[in-house]
Amino acid sequence: LGLVPGAGAQIEALRTAVGDTPITVAGKPYPPLLQETINRMQARRPVFVGDRLDTDIEGAHNVGIDSFMVFTGAHGKTDLVNAIPQQHPTAIGWNLRGLLAPRREASWHDDEVLCRGARAYVYGGVVRLDGPLITVDEQLDALWAIVQLTWRDGSLDAADALDALDQLP
């Protein structure tokens, strides 16, 4: 099928038809529905898992909870690199199984970022990679290192580094 319009497109069509803006929207990424879910579940440490940056991850950001981006749906590595701050997930994984694995931690060392066996650094405004890139997990480690750099400096060229992550959408 490819990408299809979500509820936001339907709400926008309704807004245009009636010529008014709703006072409150109870859908992602807006807080009411998410906050009500957290309250009803009495969640102490909720994590929002999703594949869309503009609804799932931004929704988590809007209610102040952690988010976990999976790569089995709508958005991929390039979307993540180019995400605006309120769409930055707090963690990433290939799918739901990633929730059971240790969380990816990125650490800065001078002008480079390390994540497990991956190293991302900048040379001449271009993001470069070192480390193994054979498995999906190794590529996710590298991606997590890359986004730390690009989220700090949006002018960096990460195209070649992203191309090396050939198992990620």
Model-predicted regions and their roles:
Residues 1-169:
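Asp-based, Mg2+/Mn2+-dependent phosphohydrolase catalytic module
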